[in-house]
A protein has these predicted regions:
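A structural motif corresponding to the C-terminal end of an alpha-helix
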Residues: 106-120, 150-159, 188, 228-238, ...
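Noncatalytic carbohydrate-binding groove/subsite architecture in carbohydrate-active enzymes
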Residues: 228, 232-239, 243-247, 266, ...
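Active-site metal-binding loops of divalent metal-dependent hydrolases
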Residues: 1, 127, 244, 284, ...
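Mid-to-C-terminal alpha-helical segments outside catalytic/metal-binding sites
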Residues: 2-97, 101-107, 191, 197, ...
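Active-site gating/metal-coordination segments in enzymes
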Residues: 115-256, 310, 315
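Aromatic- and acidic-residue-enriched segments that line the glycan-binding/catalytic groove
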Residues: 2-14, 135-140, 250-263
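Well-ordered, non-membrane alpha-helical segments in soluble/globular domains
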Residues: 70-72, 78-110, 134-151, 174-183, ...
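H/E-rich (His + Asp/Glu) clusters that bind or coordinate divalent metals
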Residues: 272-394
């Protein structure tokens, strides 16, 4: 396979060969490069020459990303930073890289590098999109579990994996999916489970509030498959992480499935069974000012049924406030929620959603930006470690 640099060089050529004849892409890329490289910057942050799309573009974007040589959002004079096309190519590069390469890139940026924030461990979540999206994965889920088990072991526990659960598969495969998940939890060092409601299902309450999806199990069947997971995880003391932002679905209707309604239904159903499941509402409702999900999840945390409901600030990119009112609004909304619901100091965790975050400028600065945005209204020690230990286990 060669070195990481050799792999990225070949990958860069392959991506160029795929896209070089796509006039729309190359025009958008070249125009955005010129706009981004010529944007006015603050004193001491000199703009660089624009580069046309070529066979080395992805490799160069990845090199600049690893060298942390790009400009931070605060380096630009305008309230809204210009387009960042290096981030698009870097994101593609990471998506097409081997997982060990990405783990090293993460560790270098956040832990071992000279300017790293000092992350002690990372939670790496698998996701199961079978049936909801096509085509099916090229690598069997069992093999992906074994790979993440090995990565965790080789990193001396630095990467702690979460196994994926898919209620569509679980409703149709006579227990195979649940058995695979429980084996990962019981025998392979996995610390929790990941579900993905924007695929088209709520964490619970699909029988009443579900979304009709062609070929999918009924809402009741999905609820039954999900409750099996919730009760098994509650009995084992294992957390379940789920996307809780209005994003990453096929449509608004799919993205609605990640909202507070499903969490209220779940907490009610678990309470009726005398069960308490640890839950991480990933993205804490999302950073966009388009709904009240963050506030509603915070309210749920303050209820008796929500005593084990946590949330993370993964990819709250608008906390990286550069002066744009739209971006600073995210900080104000989070601060308002923390003031109204002090329980947030006991439940909200730092998170990065790193692979998605990798398309942003100087993503290695993200934890510093989150700290700067929240230090006046959230407990720093709890946000950066204490609450994660309570949710995922020390």
């Amino acid at each position: 396979m060669g070195t990481r640099d050799e792999y990225l060089r070949g990958l860069s050529r392959r991506v160029y060969d795929k896209l070089k004849d796509n006039r729309e892409f190359t025009t958008l890329y070249n125009d955005a490069q010129r706009a981004g490289r010529s944007a006015p910057t603050v004193r001491g942050a000199a703009p660089t020459a624009a580069e046309s799309f070529g066979e080395g573009s992805l490799e160069q974007a990845m090199r600049r990303d690893r060298e942390r040589s790009g400009l931070h959002v605060e380096s630009f004079e305008s309230a809204q930073p210009p387009p960042y096309v290096d981030g698009v190519l870097a994101f593609v590069g990471y998506m097409l890289s081997y997982r060990w390469m990405n783990l090293l890139a993460y560790q270098e940026a956040f832990t071992s590098g000279p300017q790293a924030f000092g992350v002690d461990e990372v939670y790496g979540a698998l996701v199961d999109f079978d049936h909801w999206l096509t085509p099916p994965p090229r690598t069997a889920h069992e093999d992906q579990i074994k790979l993440h088990q090995l990565l965790s072991q080789l990193s001396a526990g630095y990467m702690r994996p979460l196994v994926a659960y898919n209620p569509w598969s679980a409703a149709r495969d006579n227990g195979r999916t649940l058995k695979r998940v429980l084996d990962a939890l019981d025998a392979r060092g996995f610390v929790g489970v990941k579900i993905y409601p924007p695929n088209g299902y709520r964490p619970y309450g699909n029988a009443r509030y579900g979304l009709p999806v062609a070929g999918a199990p009924t809402g009741r069947e999905l609820d039954d498959a999900l409750m099996l997971l919730w009760t098994q995880c509650a009995d084992r003391g294992k957390p379940v992480m789920a996307h809780s932002g209005h994003s990453m679905g096929k449509s608004d209707a799919y993205e609605d499935m990640a909202g507070p309604l499903g969490w209220r239904e779940l907490l009610r159903a678990l309470s009726e069974q005398g069960k308490v499941a640890r839950i991480n509402a990933g993205h804490f409702g999302g950073d966009a000012n388009t709904n009240t999900w963050t506030e509603e999840i915070a309210k749920l945390m303050a209820t008796p049924e929500g005593a084990a409901l946590f949330a993370d600030l993964g990819y709250w990119d608008e906390l990286r406030c550069s002066g744009a009112p739209r971006m600073c609004e995210a900080t104000r909304r989070l601060a308002d929620a923390a003031t109204a619901h002090p329980v947030l100091n006991e439940r909200v965790m730092y998170g990065s959603d790193w692979l998605m975050l990798s398309q942003e400028r100087r993503w290695d600065r993200y934890p510093f930006d989150v700290l700067a945005a929240t230090r006046t209204f959230l407990n720093t020690n709890a946000l950066f470690g204490g609450n994660a230990k309570k949710c995922f286990g020390a």
